[in-house]
Amino acid sequence: MKSLQALFGGTFDPVHYGHLKPVETLANLIGLTRVTIIPNNVPPHRPQPEANSMQRKHMLELAIADKPLFTLDERELKRNAPSYTAQTLKEWRQEQGPDVPLAFIIGQDSLLTFPTWYEYETILDNAHLIVCRRPGYPLEMAQPQYQQWLEDHLTHNPEDLHLQPAGKIYLAETPWFNISATIIRERLQNGESCEDLLPEPVLTYINQQGLYR
């Protein structure tokens, strides 16, 4: 049986412990040996990043340098068009073949808006969804047809993610860290400490580059 590959996308502006620690816990919970981080270049759902793509890439490299669980995929950074998860997962599926189990990691907030994503209905054709639970967010989708979609694909057994190549949604009980890139940027702008929010090499680089001031 081929091992489950997991992808983790985002803007990472900047990368912080709220990104890394839940995924590290997730890896232990469901038996992931490798998580590929895919930073967006031009995120279609959010304002443009404050740090440029190369700065965000370098911060990620610093953050995961001592973490063998993580590796970096730059394909979306090399696009000059918006980064769409559906497109990236189609590419990954074509590269890996039809039988390799593949999963995409998202937060619970993203699950609730998932039906607004570009070609969202194709994503489960190519991968599983692993959802990191977050307090304060409902477990139900906003509309009945999307709730039915969720229930049709939902599994409570993480082993299903390893046994099938795609098509399942798993809600993972991961720790919640009240950290966001927005909070970090605001604290940096106000000259407040962020030492407990992100890896030290990343903070050193931010200060050296004068980012988020």
From Swiss-Prot:
CDD domains: NMNAT (cd02165). It catalyses: nicotinate beta-D-ribonucleotide + ATP + H(+) = deamido-NAD(+) + diphosphate. GO terms for molecular function: ATP binding; nicotinate-nucleotide adenylyltransferase activity. Keywords: ATP-binding, NAD, Nucleotide-binding, Nucleotidyltransferase, Pyridine nucleotide biosynthesis, Transferase. The keyword Signal does not apply. Pfam families: CTP_transf_like (PF01467). Pathway: Cofactor biosynthesis; NAD(+) biosynthesis; deamido-NAD(+) from nicotinate D-ribonucleotide: step 1/1. InterPro entries: Cyt_trans-like, NadD/NMNAT, Rossmann-like_a/b/a_fold. Its EC number is 2.7.7.18. Catalyzes the reversible adenylation of nicotinate mononucleotide (NaMN) to nicotinic acid adenine dinucleotide (NaAD). PANTHER family: NICOTINATE-NUCLEOTIDE ADENYLYLTRANSFERASE-RELATED, PHOSPHOPANTETHEINE ADENYLYLTRANSFERASE. This is Probable nicotinate-nucleotide adenylyltransferase. It comes from Escherichia coli O1:K1 / APEC. The gene is nadD.
